[in-house]
Amino acid sequence: MGLFMIIAILLFQKPTVTEQLKKCWNNYVQGHCRKICRVNEVPEALCENGRYCCLNIKELEACKKITKPPRPKPATLALTLQDYVTIIENFPSLKTQST
């Protein structure tokens, strides 16, 4: 009976913080706190418990591919020949100086 009680107590104990597989990084890419990262993972930062935040390479690359749309180019202010002629006609002082 005593052995059963000891086993029951050990089974119901919560693991410590370092034994838990904690999630880390941000909302877009989830990583796991580990001492050594797996082959398909990259250590990106340190977790609170001193372990590495291991991120999956495929998820990280997929997140980098999602980019913001490019900014619209500003309108160019190039004058056409007709615009230039209109400007000259509106300024009579320029006409008199050029003749």
From Swiss-Prot:
Residues 66-99 form a propeptide. It comes from the Eukaryota. It comes from Homo sapiens (Human). Pfam families: Defensin_beta_2. Belongs to the beta-defensin family. GO terms for cellular component: extracellular region. Residues 1-20 form the signal peptide. PANTHER family: BETA-DEFENSIN 123, BETA-DEFENSIN 123-RELATED. This is Beta-defensin 127. The keyword Signal applies. It is found in: Secreted. Disulfide bonds join 24-53, 33-47, 37-54. One of its GO terms (biological process) is defense response to bacterium. Has antibacterial activity.
